[in-house]
Amino acid sequence: MLKWALIFFVISLIAGFLGFSGVSAATAGIAKILFYIAVIIFLVFLVLALAVGGAVT
């Protein structure tokens, strides 16, 4: 049981260090960029499916 407590303590220290440093702001920016790229790809595939989907069936 003490082993798991120490493991979670170390994980919480690492998460706290990353959360309270500037790393979190940089990763949030990257996550926003990846989100918008995923939305654009989704919209492109949606338009393609609607345009070509009728021709397939």
From Swiss-Prot:
Top-level lineage group: Bacteria
InterPro entries in UniProt: DUF1328 (IPR009760)
Swiss-Prot/TrEMBL keywords: Cell membrane, Membrane, Plasmid, Transmembrane, Transmembrane helix
One matching Pfam family: DUF1328
Main location: membrane
Gene Ontology cellular component list: plasma membrane
Key word Chloroplast present: no
Membrane topology: Multi-pass membrane protein
Segments crossing the lipid bilayer: 4-24, 33-53
Compartment(s): Cell membrane
NCBIfam families (alphabetical): PRK13682.2-5
Family: Belongs to the UPF0391 family.
Protein's name according to its UniProt entry: UPF0391 membrane protein RB0084
Source species taxonomy: Bacteria, Pseudomonadati, Pseudomonadota, Alphaproteobacteria, Hyphomicrobiales
